[in-house]
Amino acid sequence: MNEKDVVDLLKKVESIGVNVWITGGWGVDAILGRQTRPHSDIDFFVQKKDASAFIEMIKSNGYCRTKVESDDQSVWCAAHDRTIDLHLFEFAEEGTLRFENETYPSDILNGKGTIGEVMVRCLTAEAQVIYHQGYEQKEKDRHDVLLLCNTFGFLIPEEYACERPKQ
């Protein structure tokens, strides 16, 4: 998904009054204020209470649900290789949020960044690094984590510290 597609989509989201948070590769690039690699999709965190409005908006813009990962996560695709990975969450007890039946501190959503000229909410840099752990990483994950760690002075997680052979 290119920057123009993302900016156009963000403007449409803003027009319906739904708050979104960006995560994944575009979330990393938003924090850094520049695009650092190509992206196949954009990951949106949307409150469950806003899910219907958000889904209606993307459907009216040509997106169709192509995959359901769980009740809280689905993939939506449109023409021209535009893909949305939609994550639904809800704010819970004071200072927490619930996603996929897990509880997280809500301050993970305190990140701010830019995509193009658009200011966006996103996961914090530290949260991006934390949630890029514990699964088999792709080269793009390695790129994102190392870039965040080097930019913000975070310790590189052990699973990213060793150079992996190219496959």
Per-region residue spans from a language model:
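Compositionally biased terminal segments of proteins
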Residues: 1-167
